[in-house]
């Protein structure tokens, strides 16, 4: 049994001396070649297509951002031009409104003056008609007064002659 333990200890010592953390035999360069081959395959199959897609996407985004910036600049320029045109149109409309108001005020003033003249003419005409009628009435009254005075006079005289 002691021999058996001795043989087991020798086998364990032999196993430890053969394989350690790094074995410098043909396996190490083979593993290095496998890693390099794996890296080349991954680069060709995975990394290059992914990098290409990422580059295309970046270019697409950059292109869209540039187009959006151009469109935004054009929209802002158009907006400024429309605002400028709108301000000019408002000024012109305000000028037209003020001219129309002045013309309307002038027309109203003329119509008021004409109405005042017409009213004055009507008043003068009515006054002259009233004065004319007054003169006629006074003349008629004077004639009647004269007639009545003549009648009274003749009655008085006839009464005096009779008495």
Curated annotation (Swiss-Prot):
GO terms for cellular component: chloroplast thylakoid membrane; proton-transporting ATP synthase complex. Keywords: ATP synthesis, ATP-binding, CF(0), Chloroplast, Hydrogen ion transport, Ion transport, Membrane, Nucleotide-binding, Plastid, Thylakoid, Transmembrane, Transmembrane helix, Transport. It is a single-pass membrane protein. Belongs to the ATPase B chain family. In plastids the F-type ATPase is also known as CF(1)CF(0). PANTHER family: ATP SYNTHASE SUBUNIT B', CHLOROPLASTIC (PTHR33445:SF2). This is ATP synthase subunit b', chloroplastic. The lineage of its organism: Eukaryota, Cryptophyceae, Pyrenomonadales, Geminigeraceae, Guillardia. The gene is atpF2.
